[in-house]
């Protein structure tokens, strides 16, 4: 199991095996094996430091078949935690885009550019994440088709030429451990 040990000054990620777990304490075994556990101390942490398990969450868009036939699919935002079965979070999410704010100069006060994941030159320079979602209504409404195109963080989609209502949502998340 992977854990994060952190206080306000230091952070360390390590692998360990719980050997005694009660309601108030967990003892961690530190047997050394290739690529998993530490062979040296990980540093001096302040009082109040926290040890928490690493949680891996994957977010993705997947079609949900409501009934047979292509007209009956519904795109939705799903999440899978630590490889578990995915759960549907939000129905109608057609597009999910992420761009990463890069601090080229290293002063950690400004974002010099936003890039896609495959263009991140150094993940240590990422100081923010820009997210965009295009969400559609579950049902078609009215008589007019949607002739619009939508710019989801630089990816232009549409026109869809259906009668669904759509909204574009964007937000920027600052990574607090990366900024001053």
Walk through the language-model features, giving the residues of each.
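Short, solvent-exposed secondary-structure boundary/capping segments
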Residues: 20-34, 102
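Short coil/turn segments at the loop-to-beta-strand junctions that recur within blades
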Residues: 34-36, 84
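Ser/Thr/Gly-rich low-complexity blocks that favor extended beta-strand/coil architectures
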Residues: 1-23
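A structural detector for beta-sheet-dominated domains
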Residues: 6, 17, 29-31, 62, ...
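Extended Gly/Ser/Thr-rich low-complexity repeat segments
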Residues: 1-4, 36-55
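Short linear sequence signals and composition-biased patches located at protein termini or domain-edge surfaces
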Residues: 47-180
């Amino acid at each position: 199991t992977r854990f994060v040990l952190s206080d306000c000054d230091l952070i360390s990620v390590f692998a360990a095996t719980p050997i005694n777990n009660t309601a108030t304490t967990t003892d961690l075994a530190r047997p050394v094996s290739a690529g998993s556990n530490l062979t040296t101390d990980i540093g001096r942490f302040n009082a109040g430091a926290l040890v928490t398990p690493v949680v891996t969450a994957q977010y993705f868009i997947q079609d949900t078949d409501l009934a047979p036939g292509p007209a009956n699919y519904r795109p939705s935002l799903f999440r899978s935690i630590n490889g578990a079965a995915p759960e549907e979070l939000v129905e109608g999410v057609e597009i999910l885009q992420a761009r990463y704010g890069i601090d080229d100069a290293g002063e950690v006060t400004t974002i010099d550019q936003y890039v896609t994941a495959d263009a991140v030159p150094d993940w240590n320079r990422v100081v923010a994440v820009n997210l965009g979602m295009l969400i559609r209504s579950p049902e078609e409404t009215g008589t007019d088709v949607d002739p619009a195109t939508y710019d989801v963080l630089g990816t232009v989609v549409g026109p869809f030429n259906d009668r669904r209502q759509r909204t574009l949502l964007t937000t920027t998340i600052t990574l607090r451990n990366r900024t001053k």
